[in-house]
Amino acid sequence: PLQYRADAEVFIISKSRYGVDPYTVVKSAERVGENIAQVMKTDDFYQKVITQEGYILDLTDFEGEGVTERTKRKRWQKAIQSSVVFGTGVLHVSAYHEDPGQAKAFAGASVDTLVAKGWEYVGGDVTMKVVNKPVVTKFPARPNLLVNTVLGFIVGVLLMGVVALRRK
């Protein structure tokens, strides 16, 4: 199935101590961001996201009938991805879903969860702020590879047929 991507960004602010240079503060924020990127893949973070107020999330992919815990975790790890923009202390969060509105909702709930409850993962000396609200891609970000492969094969055969007929 085609999936849309919603991107949001969170700025990680390390409360600096006197005598610490800005480079060290940014490097500290990067390290915290790397840790958070790993924590976002966990079931604990998933539970916090789905209870985040202000968002209506479609959880059928994660909690539908016959979905095992292992399947739920794999799907969650594919649905939410995050990475640190190096040199900035900015955490880039992407959410994927078949419905663009749901992709935006999952990205928004994820970054709001980080701002509200991220201190549980990194301690109290770090604060986070949403610097870019979620924005959805206009076109699907994850195409259906099987359909694209079959269509590519068919178009290739048709084009080769046209080329072969013109050469005769």
Task: Please state what every model-predicted region is.
Residues P1-K168:
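Hydrophobic and amphipathic membrane-targeting/association helices
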